[in-house]
Regions:
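Bacterial Sec-dependent N-terminal signal peptides
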Residues: 1-30
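C-terminal functional modules
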Residues: 373-493
Length: 493
């Protein structure tokens, strides 16, 4: 396990005032604003690689039984721009310090993390501040214009290309990345992650032929020939340690109303997917009846479309499965993943099916599935016995899972997306939701009169303090005064 030093920028600022006691914090003790990049990077990694639970309600893995959850019923309204005020400001600081110390590697990471955050922001909202963003301190620019979503995506792809170039240079000259809690300082591994993430971004844009100057399909082919994540040992993942502030996010979580979704349980049961045993617990009713963990009939979920009280009744009757306790009883949990080998293989499989690259879609599909089982076998502790290589081979023979060349391209993509979906349990943030918007898969249960949203409305603070730019962006995209969660952004038109 890599030693982790997680120091917030605020703490660094306080420590910098005491250079006589903490002389190694600043390369220049006469400049209190100078902070070694190795002290900034851990916090950036921690924030980017952690995964939350909010999206799991929206993409139908869990239900709430002790209250009404707006994500579960697609009733959210406004998002926030906290990435601008927190994470991206840290990334800007990393760039400043990278330039100060002349580090190629940190510059590469700057471009990667900028791309990562702006990718997520534009998926959430549509048009966002990009070219003029984060310039308040340098240029006193506090009301940045909103760039079109196409321009933002084009910029994200440019940044990832720069990340590849800078990290390749750093690797070639043997530059070690100090403060790297993901890859232990290896620039070549970050290069692989950046390139793999670039493929993910390009596939997100599968409904588009061009994005600014970028030709989506030809660029995908070009990037697919670059260094990529090659096995589970190269996953872009954050491993936790049993230390205050560095433990697994769900450790000791209070889950009084956190239960499995019926649609997810039914899907996994239908194809006899043993990963269900890692995700959920048998119902109390099944346990009392003596059913084994490996008995698929021991699992049940709640209906995500009914009032929470109906699912609460299932809790009282012992007829609904809880989330597996392994997620909250182990302080180190399992690593949380920004992007891993299993997902990358499914990205490549879909690209082959779409005709973007040459290759064997079946091989990529099966390799991705086996990689998922192998990963869980490594980290699922007492549940590892249910996801052996033999279990993966058996699962691959199920009629609803196995690769069949007789299937249509659309049917093949549906199977690929389902495998990406399965590896998203406590790992996906909002990715499976955006995959659904892009492909229609997996299909989500929802009330007939409640359309699935496409985005979040802009923050109130933007409407108040950046009024004209917000109005212009809304009108340009959706029509005047049409900032709605059901307004469709450019990327899926």
């Amino acid at each position: 396990m890599k030693t982790r030093i997680l120091i917030s920028l605020a703490l660094v600022g306080m420590l910098a005032c005491s250079c006589s006691d903490f002389g190694d914090l600043n390369d220049n003790p006469n400049d209190p604003a100078a902070v070694s990049p190795k002290l900034i990077l851990p916090n950036i990694c921690e924030n980017a690689f952690r995964r939350g639970t909010g999206g799991m309600y929206a993409y139908k893995m869990v239900v709430q039984t002790d209250g009404h959850n707006t994500d579960q019923f697609y009733e959210w309204n406004r998002g926030d721009f906290s990435f601008y005020n927190n994470e991206l400001l840290q990334v800007v600081k990393l760039k400043e310090e990278a330039d100060r110390v002349g580090s190629t590697a940190y510059n590469g990471l700057y471009h990667f993390f900028r791309a990562y955050y702006f990718y997520n922001l534009t998926l959430q909202f549509g048009d966002i501040p990009y070219s003029e963003a984060l310039q308040g301190e340098q240029k006193a620019l506090f009301t940045p214009k909103y760039d079109t979503q196409e321009m933002v995506f084009s910029g994200v792809l440019d940044e990832l290309a720069l990340a590849n170039e800078e990290l390749a240079k750093a690797a070639a000259k043997g530059e070690q990345i100090q403060g790297d809690i993901i890859y232990g300082g290896a620039a070549s591994m970050w290069q692989k992650l950046a390139n793999s993430f670039r493929l993910k971004v390009l596939l997100t844009l599968s409904n588009k032929q061009t994005v600014g100057k970028h030709q989506v399909q030809s660029e995908f082919r070009q990037v697919a020939s670059l260094p990529l994540i090659s096995d589970n040992s190269e996953n872009g993942q954050l491993q936790y340690i049993d230390q205050e502030g560095n433990r697994y996010p769900q450790f000791n979580a209070q889950w009084s109303g956190f239960y499995m979704d019926k649609t997810f349980v039914d899907r996994m049961t239908a194809c006899k997917d043993p990963r269900l045993f890692l995700f959920a617990l048998p119902t109390n009713e099944a346990s009392n009846a003596g059913k084994a963990v490996s008995d698929f009939t021991a699992y049940a979920g709640g209906n995500p479309t009914v009032p929470y009280g109906e699912n609460k009744n299932l809790v009282g009757a012992g007829q609904i499965s809880q989330i597996n306790a392994r997620y909250r009883i182990h302080p180190t949990g399992e690593p949380t993943m920004l992007l891993g080998y299993a997902e990358l293989q499914q990205i490549l499989a879909e690209a082959v099916v779409r005709g973007w690259i040459a290759g064997d879609a079946k091989r990529h599909y099966e390799e991705g599935l086996k990689a998922s089982f192998a990963w869980y076998h490594t980290y699922a502790r007492e549940y590892a016995k249910y996801v052996t290589p033999q279990d993966a081979e058996k699962y691959l023979q199920h009629d609803a899972v196995k690769w069949d060349e007789a299937l249509s391209a659309e049917q093949k993509i549906e199977r690929i997306i389902f495998q990406k979906y399965c590896v998203s349990f406590f790992q996906g943030n909002w990715d499976p939701f955006f995959e659904h918007l892009r492909t229609g898969y997996p299909k989500f249960a929802h009330l007939n009169n409640t359309p699935i949203p496409y985005r979040w409305m802009y923050p109130d603070t933007e409407s108040k303090y950046n009024t004209e730019n917000v109005k212009e962006a809304v009108t340009r995209q959706f029509g005047e005064n049409n900032d709605k969660i059901t307004s469709k952004p450019w990327w899926i038109k």
